[in-house]
Amino acid sequence: MIIEFNLLVILLVQMPLSFYMLYRLCYLLFCFLECFLNLFKKCGVFKNAKWLTRIQRVFYLYLFVYR
């Protein structure tokens, strides 16, 4: 019974909190990477920035799904 209760506490309390913190961390990472990707595009560091645009689209999709 104690083991089942501990498992229930982990599933209901600790996991959602860790997912919430993980979401916040990913959101901050996304903002940081988006800033650098836009900077690289504007400065012309890369001649072909198509792959940077694709990376940005993946990040936008990730944030749209997990919001």
Curated annotation (Swiss-Prot):
One of its GO terms (cellular component) is host cell membrane. The chain crosses the membrane at residues 26-46. It is a single-pass membrane protein. It comes from the Viruses. The keyword Transmembrane helix applies. It is found in: Host membrane. Its main location: host cell. Keywords: Host membrane, Membrane, Transmembrane, Transmembrane helix. Belongs to the plectrovirus ORF11 family. This is Uncharacterized protein ORF11.
